[in-house]
């Protein structure tokens, strides 16, 4: 997956289209990401014997990686990601501006 934790992304499809957020977690096995403050769902939880209170909590749900794009650090618009090898190390580069991301 080209998107990594702490990347700034924009949602390009679905009910949250056009919104930006930071990637909190990636799930490579399912090709999904969890973006801070986006795709919120309500979970009904039971109280646990350890003392956790039950109730309805709202939290972020996963979004498929094909529905998000990286935000270019230079102009704040969506960009694709290229992989470039320099001196034996691989880096991610924003295709829109050529800015190195790592």
Protein language model features and the residues they cover:
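A cytosolic small-molecule/anion-sensing beta-strand core signal
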Residues: 66
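Ribosome large-subunit tunnel/peptidyl-transferase-proximal elements
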Residues: 1-46, 56-60, 69-77, 83-102
